[in-house]
Curated annotation (Swiss-Prot):
Belongs to the EPSP synthase family. MurA subfamily. Its EC number is 2.5.1.7. It comes from Prochlorococcus marinus (strain MIT 9515). This is UDP-N-acetylglucosamine 1-carboxyvinyltransferase. The active site is at C128 (proton donor). One of its GO terms (cellular component) is cytoplasm. It catalyses: phosphoenolpyruvate + UDP-N-acetyl-alpha-D-glucosamine = UDP-N-acetyl-3-O-(1-carboxyvinyl)-alpha-D-glucosamine + phosphate. GO terms for molecular function: UDP-N-acetylglucosamine 1-carboxyvinyltransferase activity. Pathway: Cell wall biogenesis; peptidoglycan biosynthesis. Cell wall formation. Adds enolpyruvyl to UDP-N-acetylglucosamine. CDD domains: UdpNAET (cd01555). It comes from the Bacteria. The modification 2-(S-cysteinyl)pyruvic acid O-phosphothioketal is found at C128. GO terms for biological process: cell division; cell wall organization; peptidoglycan biosynthetic process; regulation of cell shape; UDP-N-acetylgalactosamine biosynthetic process.
Length: 458
């Protein structure tokens, strides 16, 4: 059983045609957080009662995760941005590789399935090609909880140790604050017997969102957002309603786009505390920031060079490293951006240089000498965030750019070009050299809302 989408596939021939040098102005509605929604979908497997999720973003990654759940026998019903999940009648089976390929979040299911049913079998996950993202921390942690795990032919097979009816609490110290491992172990420990303590845990807002939903379901989790998380296992979790937090990465991307184009926009809803590191660097680079309730306004001015090192939350997020580098290409002076999370996340450097940027890379540090202008090019984004960086670069470039590789963009940005166009950008999605959607006024450029997920089919 699979879901149906208005777009059956994302053709590599699709591209965004972008006319640069247009300022942005207005308000942007920020979607629900992709990285939160994905793990919350996995967490729904922990109960046989219904979970109602609101503010779910319409993204291809959400579509893929929904297909994974449906393959397990989960019933899904969605309307707009609400998703009702019924995991009562699950059939535990090995998921086909083609279903999980390209979606690293699929591996989140292993902790939930293992702790609820005593076994799980998943192919090794995929995702963006941005370097090694090993699952050693996940596996070592699950073993500490009492799981027996083997890897055969790229498939991870987990089960309870013989004579044990469930997982048992343990003290676990992560070698690094892995977000995925922290989330996987929290889910597994929620139904384990006894207390689990995770030290050196990741502190990201998405983890806090997961723990908030699990506690609504009856879990006993303490310390979310801190380096030490305590989970007292319970016998059973029940259903709940939960609203996905706003996407801080999407929010940051729009703020960076406004700064790059010397524009004034307001984004909402957002949680400003989730964006402190980004806001600090935007202010340092010359933008004026105003926070009011659940909204942030930015006024871009002359751009100054800054130094950035990516770091786990509350540090500067690695997912905004590429977009911020696009901003720094036209900054006054020399900027330095060091990537400290992933060892191979500089694919966008060569692409930005083709547009006229002056960037060199030494190990995992990019040195950006600001230039006066960029030029429009035809380029292919290599991953989700590099695609966003190229779009920002195209917005500030002279002439016209065509950005390909939209299958990456649509994984993580809901109606990205539609939102930009409402702000005044000149963007249209083309397919095979033709316009996918036209406005009544041919002089205007309007993109398509490119994904309409429908899980309400057998």
């Amino acid at each position: 059983m699979v879901c149906e989408s208005n777009n059956k596939s994302y053709l590599k021939s699709q591209n965004l045609k972008i006319i640069g040098k247009n300022s942005l102005r207005g308000n942007v509605k920020i979607s629900g957080a992709k990285n939160s929604a994905l793990v919350l979908l996995a967490a729904s497997l922990l109960t046989d009662e219904k979970i109602i999720l609101d503010n779910v973003p319409l993204l291809t990654d959400i579509e893929k995760m929904g297909n994974i759940l449906k393959n397990l026998g989960v019933k899904l019903h969605n309307k707009d941005h609400q998703l009702i999940i019924d995991s009562k009648n699950i059939s535990i089976q090995e998921l086909p590789y083609e279903l999980v390929n390209g979606l690293r979040a699929s591996f989140f299911c292993i902790g939930a399935l293992l702790t609820r049913f005593g076994k799980a079998s998943l192919p090794l996950p995929g995702g963006c090609n941005i370097g090694e993202r090993p699952i050693n921390e996940h596996i070592n942690g699950l073993r500490a909880l009492g799981a027996e795990i083997i890897i055969e032919k790229e498939v991870v097979k987990a089960k309870l140790i013989k004579k044990k009816s469930k997982l048992f609490g343990a003290n676990i110290r992560l070698n690094c604050p892995s977000v995925g491992a922290t989330e996987t172990l929290i889910m597994a420990a929620s139904l384990a017997e006894g207390r689990t303590i995770i030290e050196n845990a990741a502190r990201e807002p998405e983890i806090q969102d997961l723990c908030q939903m699990l506690n609504k379901m009856g879990a006993k989790i303490y310390g979310a957002g801190k380096e030490k998380i305590i989970i007292d296992g319970v016998q059973k979790l029940h259903g709940c309603s939960h609203k996905v937090i706003p996407d801080r990465i999407e929010a940051g991307t729009f703020l960076i786009a406004a700064a790059a184009t010397s524009s004034s926009i307001t984004i909402s809803p957002v949680i400003p505390n989730h964006l402190e590191a980004v806001l600090n660097k935007l202010e340092e680079s010359g933008s004026k920031i105003e926070k009011k309730g659940n909204s942030i306004s930015i006024s871009g001015k002359s751009i100054k060079a800054v130094k950035i090192k990516t770091a786990p939350f509350p540090g500067f997020p690695t997912d905004l490293q590429a977009p911020f580098m696009a901003l720094m290409t036209i900054a006054k002076g020399t900027s330095m951006i060091s990537e400290r999370i992933f060892e191979n996340r500089m694919h966008h450097v060569n692409l930005l240089n083709q547009m006229g940027a002056a960037i060199t890379v030494d190990d995992n540090t990019a040195i950006i000498n600001g230039v006066k202008k960029l030029k429009g090019m035809n380029l292919v984004g290599s991953d989700l965030r590099s695609s966003a960086a190229l779009i920002i670069a195209a917005l500030i470039s002279e002439n016209i750019s065509h950005i390909y590789g939209l299958e990456h963009l649509d994984r993580g940005y809901e109606n990205f070009e539609f939102k930009l166009t409402k702000l005044g950008a000149k963007i249209i999605r083309e397919v095979d050299g033709g316009i996918q959607t036209k406005s009544k006024n041919s002089s205007e450029i309007h993109p398509t809302k490119n994904l309409d997920i429908n899980f309400n089919v057998a």
